[in-house]
Amino acid sequence: MTDFIPTTDLSDAQPQAQVAAPVLRDFGGRTRFQGAAVTLRISENNPLVRQTLQTPGAGRVLVVDGGGSLNCALLGGNLGVFGVENGWEGVIIHGCVRDTAELRELDLGIRALAAHPRRSGKLEEGERDVPVTFAGVTIRPGDHVVADEDGWLVLGAESP
């Protein structure tokens, strides 16, 4: 992993940085994380999240557009463990998580809208490696995502 540069410094130095609206909460045990984005677009079903977190993360960040659903959780403790075991830096979800006490203990950055006790559906549907837009930013596969105590932002893959 490269040296961490705080989001405040990046937003000052990189005017092209897309700064996300402060709508997501921090649920993971790691507050600061960064990496290349892997994107998913799903709707209240999380098998693609599971499948992705079971692959080598190689220091990347999984960005999940769950459509902003507040009806169920797209990530819980078991999937969070897969993320840690497979080297993911973090997960950003435009949707909900559950098992928040477990997630807080993991060495994984996790941002989501809220906590919800209901599990997601198990249909294998959705899209991977597509541009996703939420919180006022568009994230493309390979874009650099940086998150810390002050928020999160997106730099294009070509940015330093």
UniProtKB/Swiss-Prot annotation:
Pfam families assigned:
RraA-like
Domain of life of the organism encoding this protein: Bacteria
**Residues involved in a divalent metal cation binding:** D99
Tell me the residue numbers annotated for binding substrate.
Answer: G76, G77, N78, L79, R98
Instruction: Kindly state a single biological-process term from the GO annotations of this entry.
Output: regulation of RNA metabolic process
Molecular function terms, GO-annotated: 4-hydroxy-4-methyl-2-oxoglutarate aldolase activity; metal ion binding; oxaloacetate decarboxylase activity; ribonuclease inhibitor activity
Q: What is its EC number?
A: 4.1.3.17, 4.1.1.112
Signal peptide boundaries = none
Tell me the disulfide pairings in this chain.
none
Task: Quote the cofactor binding remark.
Answer: Divalent metal cation.
The EC class name is: lyase
Concerning NCBIfam families, the annotation shows: NOT-MenG, PRK09372.1
What family, per the record? Belongs to the class II aldolase/RraA-like family.
Question: Main role?
Answer: Catalyzes the aldol cleavage of 4-hydroxy-4-methyl-2-oxoglutarate (HMG) into 2 molecules of pyruvate. Also contains a secondary oxaloacetate (OAA) decarboxylase activity due to the common pyruvate enolate transition state formed following C-C bond cleavage in the retro-aldol and decarboxylation reactions.
Protein name, as recorded:
Putative 4-hydroxy-4-methyl-2-oxoglutarate aldolase
